[in-house]
Amino acid sequence: IYSASKASVVSFSEMLRSELAKDDIGVSVLCPHTIDTDIWGSEKHRPSSYGESHEFEVPDRASTAMNPSRVAEIVLEGIRDNRGFIFTDAEGVTTTRIPERMNRIEQDLDWLKGKIG
């Protein structure tokens, strides 16, 4: 559900950006990577009324986590520059997954062209 909701926000933002461009209204979607927050420690604040949670392993990402203040700077600059996508990771996941996804889409379009001529 989590990944599907993120994909929905991205898709909705793309369509909204396209539809509002004629009115000179920009829409940006933040696609953050690891941010230096206490999200992995949030379990200690979980109310007991929510019941027990599932065990999970906390990833060691402290060395690559971005400072929230730096994220805020990037977001503000991205909005000012009317960027459609605002990323916080210029390497790794972002630079590998996006080209892989585009390649799969192009392959499927090529397949379709072969079917319909």
Task: Indicate where each model-derived feature is located.
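Terminal hydrophobic/aromatic helix or amphipathic segment near a protein terminus
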Residues: 85-103
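Conserved alpha-helical elements of the SDR catalytic core
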Residues: 8, 15-16, 20
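Non-catalytic terminal and boundary segments that flank Rossmann-like NAD(P)-dependent oxidoreductase
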Residues: 105-117
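Catalytic tyrosine of NAD(P)H-dependent dehydrogenase/reductases that use a Tyr as the general acid/base
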Residues: 2, 10
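Enrichment for repetitive, rod-forming helical segments
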Residues: 13, 24, 108-111
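SDR active-site lid
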Residues: 18, 22-90
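Active-site helix of classical SDR
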Residues: 5
